[in-house]
């Protein structure tokens, strides 16, 4: 069904400080089930490059080139990160300024691995946390390409389970996931209790 939903307008909200809107029109959604990464458990696409509007505050620590970052908040206008705050703000902005594509998003992915529930500062695991999604400044993958090119690809994770503040993901006007659990009948099989 995630393939069927491609072409939708996305809206993501959470109580602590995220309100994002973007389009994924004409960009494929890619199912990840162990062909490229182990562990796996995500479906990814990319936003139309200039479509991202709003703000997001990540609640999982992220490790990038040996530096741990906390409480990153990004603000977007016409797809571009116009403000980035958090721990080590100078280094954060320096990384995003690596090149022109560093301030645009190259990936959006919904994660659902039932065996990964807490961040561990290893992005191959953290990006699969059940009830999370990641939003990635930098380079887009060729198989879900929005045209953004960059030397960086920095997966940043927001966990939407109730113990992390909750949140909602909407495709068009349909609530798809609430507080980390899929609420659309066709996607309920991806909830942790159905995958274990």
Task: State the predicted function of each range.
Residues 13, 18-196:
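N-terminal small-residue-enriched
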Residues 1-7, 11-12:
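Single conserved hydrophobic/aromatic residue that forms the stacking wall/gate
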């Amino acid at each position: 069904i995630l393939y069927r939903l491609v072409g939708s307008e996305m809206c993501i909200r959470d109580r602590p400080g995220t309100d994002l809107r973007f389009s994924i029109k004409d960009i494929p959604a890619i199912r990840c089930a162990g062909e490229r990464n182990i562990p796996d458990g995500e479906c990814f696409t990319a936003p139309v490059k200039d479509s991202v509007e709003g703000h997001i505050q990540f609640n999982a620590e992220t490790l990038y080139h040996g530096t741990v970052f906390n409480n990153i908040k990004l603000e977007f206008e016409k797809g571009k990160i116009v403000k980035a705050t958090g721990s080590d703000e100078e280094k954060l902005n320096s990384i995003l300024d690596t090149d022109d594509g560093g301030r645009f998003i190259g990936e959006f992915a919904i994660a659902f691995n039932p065996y990964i529930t807490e961040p561990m500062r290893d992005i191959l695991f953290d990006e699969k946390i059940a009830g999370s999604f990641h939003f990635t400044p930098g380079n887009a993958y060729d198989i879900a390409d929005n045209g953004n090119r960059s030397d960086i690809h920095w997966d940043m994770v927001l966990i939407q389970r109730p113990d992390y503040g909750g949140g909602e993901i909407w495709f068009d006007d349909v609530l798809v996931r609430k507080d980390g659990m899929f609420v659309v009948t066709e996607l309920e099989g991806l909830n942790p209790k159905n995958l274990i």
